[in-house]
Curated annotation (Swiss-Prot):
Highest taxon listed in the record's lineage: Bacteria
Family listed: Belongs to the heat shock protein 70 family.
PROSITE patterns reported for this sequence: HSP70_1, HSP70_2, HSP70_3
Keywords: ATP-binding, Chaperone, Nucleotide-binding
InterPro entries: ATPase_NBD (IPR043129), Heat_shock_70_CS (IPR018181), HSP70_C_sf (IPR029048), HSP70_peptide-bd_sf (IPR029047), Hsp_70_fam (IPR013126), ISC_FeS_clus_asmbl_HscA (IPR010236)
HAMAP family noted in UniProt: HscA (MF_00679)
Function: Chaperone involved in the maturation of iron-sulfur cluster-containing proteins. Has a low intrinsic ATPase activity which is markedly stimulated by HscB.
GO molecular function, one term: ATP hydrolysis activity
UniProt name for this protein: Chaperone protein HscA homolog
Any one biological process term the GO annotation gives: iron-sulfur cluster assembly
Gene that produces this protein: hscA
A Pfam family that the UniProt record links to this protein: HSP70
Length: 620
């Protein structure tokens, strides 16, 4: 998808003709809005000169709402009604939210978890919309007019549910979404245009609540994401939790009041940020029961606490490189994104892995918003000379559908460039079949039971035909936002059915890691299972077709032949339930051998019937 606007050489839109579009980084910890002004992307500040808007919303009695820094100051005093890190709950179920250990009262509801506040039960979409509305108003105040749209960034590992939740939040905030853009890709836009760099680059994005690693190939203005990885529940918040656990050793933190837990996390974050520039930092919190928790955290102690968390990010980086078929030495540079990458321990270990000093030319808090602003400006039609780059994102997990025997037919493999459309033809299994069930799945395994179910729908109105005669074309389409739609069409009649995939909740980080790891560790067993299922399906098809043939033309066999076929038919029917692939294959072959002459006689009868009463010249 070339993101180009054609104009006469040297032309540029007049100021009054420019369409106002912004890039928004909807972050876990902080959110920002940026725009291109005088051909330069810049982050927009509020009336107090602050560019970072804390992603915090406090709900008060009477309907009042506090957003940003004001809400953040009250989180320790009113933790249940002050929602922070809401991005972690986008598209999630109540079970996922509770497992995160966040100090809120979660309510299970259809589609997505809700958070209980004094203003009722609110969805993460509604909370995020409050943050987006503030950013929209800030942009309109600074730019002096209404916006035509926004590009909003999301982690590359966000699945369909999380992306759709982000779109819904923007719509609630009165924003027209021009595109959802993967955060690492946004960073690549900012760095690529500034540095005019080419080669293989890694984008290491460690934010407040999510981690993404993307491997990109930059060639002559083309940004191609060739592999992605990450963890949707790993970020700066987890480093804060590690500090709390260390400072409160021997204390059952989970049993403390919510206000105390929130105060501990606030103190931990302050200590973590102080250690960026200092050798040690104080950790002091007075609990509601009067007890004081005091500690001094050194940088060495923090690095020890952080090591397993940083190690998880490096494991993801190694997996992404393997997916791309690259070695560490192939990477020309590493772009650092996200406020958590300011931690010296992160920069040191990332540099050690890749053997190069990470790139930190641009503010890691702002780089994603700047890249999104450039993309938004382009999509709005405000193209300037030289802005002729192309974005190629990828999907993180394979997409396919269920076939006979519970097998997965992979339609779009993981790491395929998006937007993408792939189609494949299927047929009916039984004579006279007039409907087909389409089961869409996501994952890397060969069996449907080992993959994630995304959607089901039925195609009805298939003309009755013999098994295998109908042609049903199934098309998978993934748009530039990573959202999937599936269409099934019967070719002769044009009858069609479709579904837009919006799963009720997203994958947890553990599920994502398991799906990718299992595809490697279970490869041999999956191959054996596929072979067995395929043989079982073949046995079932042969048993059904032979049974139908005997019912129609059984008189073509003499008693001895019929007895042999019946015996082989029964053996093949019983073999369908066996777990021995060779035994099933042998039973199928035996039945095929026993019915070979029978099939020839049926063919002769069919030909004679077709020729009966016809003259030779009619066949010429």
């Amino acid at each position: 998808m070339a993101l180009l606007q054609i104009s006469e050489p040297g032309d540029s839109p007049a100021p009054h003709q420019r369409k106002l579009a912004v890039g928004i980084d909807l972050g876990t910890t902080n959110s920002l809005v940026a725009a291109v002004r005088s051909s330069v992307p810049e982050v927009l500040a509020d009336a107090q000169g602050q560019v970072l808007l804390p992603s915090a919303v406090r709900y008060l009695d009477g309907g009042a709402v506090r957003i940003g820094r004001e809400a953040l100051l009250e989180q320790a005093r009113d933790p249940l009604n002050t929602i922070v890190s809401v991005k972690r709950f986008m598209g999630r179920s109540a079970a996922d939210a509770v497992a995160s250990g966040a100090p809120y009262e979660f309510v299970d509801a259809p589609g997505m978890v809700r958070l209980r506040t004094v203003q009722g039960d609110l969805s993460p979409v509604e909370v995020s919309a409050q943050i987006l509305a503030v950013l929209r108003q800030r942009a309109e105040d600074v730019l002096g007019d209404d916006l035509v749209g926004a590009v909003i960034t999301v982690p590359a590992y966000f699945d369909d549910a999380q992306r759709q939740a982000t779109r819904d939040a923007a719509r609630l905030a009165g924003l027209n979404v021009l595109r959802l853009l993967n955060e690492p890709t946004a960073a690549a836009i900012a760095y690529g245009l500034d540095q005019a760099a080419e080669g293989i680059y890694a984008v290491y994005d460690l934010g407040g609540g999510t981690f993404d690693i993307s491997i990109l190939r930059l060639t002559q203005g083309v940004f191609e994401v060739i592999a992605t990885g990450g963890d949707t529940a790993l970020g700066g918040d987890d480093f804060d939790s590690a500090i709390v656990a260390h400072a409160c050793a021997g204390e059952d933190v989970a049993a403390l009041p919510v206000a105390d837990r929130r105060a501990l996390l606030v103190a931990a974050r302050a200590a973590r940020e102080a250690l960026t520039d200092q050798a040690q930092a104080p950790f002091e919190v007075t609990l509601r029961d009067g007890r004081a928790i005091q500690a001094t955290l050194t940088r060495a102690q923090f690095e020890q606490l952080a090591e397993p968390l940083v190690g998880r990010t490096l494991d993801s980086a190694r997996r992404a490189l393997r997916d791309a078929g690259l070695a560490v030495g192939d990477v020309r540079g590493v772009v650092m994104v996200g406020g958590a990458t300011r931690m010296p321990v992160v920069r040191q270990q990332v540099g050690a892995l890749f053997g190069t000093e990470p790139l930190t030319n641009l503010d890691p808090d702002q780089v994603v918003a700047l890249g999104a602003a450039l993309q938004a400006n382009l999509l709005a039609g405000n193209r300037a000379p030289g802005e002729d780059w192309l974005l190629l994102d990828v999907i993180p997990l394979s997409l396919g559908l269920e076939t006979m025997g519970g097998l997965v037919e992979r339609i779009i493999p993981r790491n395929s460039t998006i937007p993408v459309a792939r189609a494949q033809e299927f047929t009916t299994f039984k004579d006279g079949q007039t409907a087909m069930s389409v089961h869409v799945v996501q994952g890397e395994r060969d069996l449907v039971s080992d993959c994630r179910s995304l959607a089901r729908f039925e195609l009805r109105g298939i003309p009755p035909m013999v098994a295998g005669a109908a042609r049903i074309r199934v098309t998978f389409q993934v748009d530039a936002d990573g959202l999937l739609s599936v269409t099934a069409r019967e070719q002769s009649t044009g009858v069609e059915a479709a579904v837009a995939v919006k799963p009720s909740y997203g994958l947890s980080d553990d599920e994502i890691a398991r799906m990718l790891a299992d595809s490697v560790t279970q490869a041999d067993s999956d191959a054996r299972a596929r072979m067995l299922r395929e043989q079982q399906v073949e046995a079932r098809q042969l048993v059904e077709s032979v049974g139908a043939a005997l019912a129609a033309d059984g008189d073509l066999l003499d008693p001895a032949e019929r007895a042999t076929v019946d015996q082989r038919l029964q053996a093949a029917a019983q073999a369908q339930s066996l777990d021995d692939v060779e035994a099933v294959r042998a039973a199928v072959q035996a039945l095929s051998d026993a019915t070979e002459e029978f099939a020839a006689r049926r063919m002769d009868r069919s030909i004679r019937a077709a020729l009966a009463g016809r003259k030779l010249d009619e066949l010429a």
